[in-house]
């Protein structure tokens, strides 16, 4: 099954909703990550020395990058049917940080929960599936670059 124009549009519109309140949704995203995997705190330099998730420029920048990469993956999936990493260092960075398969699952769950929150009454199973497919393609590309 190919990624459709409608799926790309759903990802793009909810990406815009996410960006409209980046501070709030960044904190929400990392709070969900740490609720699901408290040990993941050590993977993020901007979280290591704080008792709880707090808004910061680094936190926002990283959240924007994660969600932006998934959005870019949606665009690539629609255009080419696959995802090629624009940043060749992503695999090495994830290896250096000690990222393993279960971390990708946690990030996916947190990402989908955050998008549901950001989309509000525009959320649907179809929107969720579009983000899920785009995230899975990105995660596959990162894992490939890690090996």
From Swiss-Prot:
Subcellular location: Cytoplasm, Cytosol; Nucleus
Residues where heme b binds: 45, 65, 94, 97
Domain of life of the native organism: Eukaryota
Tissues expressing this chain: Root nodules.
Domain annotation Globin: ranges: 2-147
Annotated Gene Ontology cellular component terms: cytosol; nucleus
GO MF term (any one): heme binding
Changes after translation: Nitrated in effective nodules and particularly in hypoxic conditions; this mechanism may play a protective role in the symbiosis by buffering toxic peroxynitrite NO(2)(-). Nitration level decrease during nodule senescence. Phosphorylation at Ser-45 disrupts the molecular environment of its porphyrin ring oxygen binding pocket, thus leading to a reduced oxygen consumption and to the delivery of oxygen O(2) to symbiosomes.
CDD domains: class1-2_nsHbs_Lbs (cd08923)
Binding residues for O2: 62
Modified residues (Nitrated tyrosine): 25, 30, 135
Pfam family for this entry, one: Globin
UniProt key word Iron: yes
Main localisation: cytoplasm
Keyword Cell wall biogenesis/degradation: no
Phosphoserine modification, residue list: 45
Keywords: Cytoplasm, Heme, Iron, Metal-binding, Nitration, Nitrogen fixation, Nodulation, Nucleus, Oxygen transport, Phosphoprotein, Transport
InterPro entries with a match to the protein in the record: Globin, Globin-like_sf, Globin/Proto, Leghaemoglobin-like, Leghaemoglobin_Fe_BS
GO biological process, one term: nodulation
Family: Belongs to the plant globin family.
Subunit structure: Monomer.
Function as written in the Swiss-Prot or TrEMBL entry: Leghemoglobin that reversibly binds oxygen O(2) through a pentacoordinated heme iron. In root nodules, facilitates the diffusion of oxygen to the bacteroids while preventing the bacterial nitrogenase from being inactivated by buffering dioxygen, nitric oxide and carbon monoxide, and promoting the formation of reactive oxygen species (ROS, e.g. H(2)O(2)). This role is essential for symbiotic nitrogen fixation (SNF).
Protein name as it appears in the record: Leghemoglobin-1
Species the sequence originates in: Medicago sativa
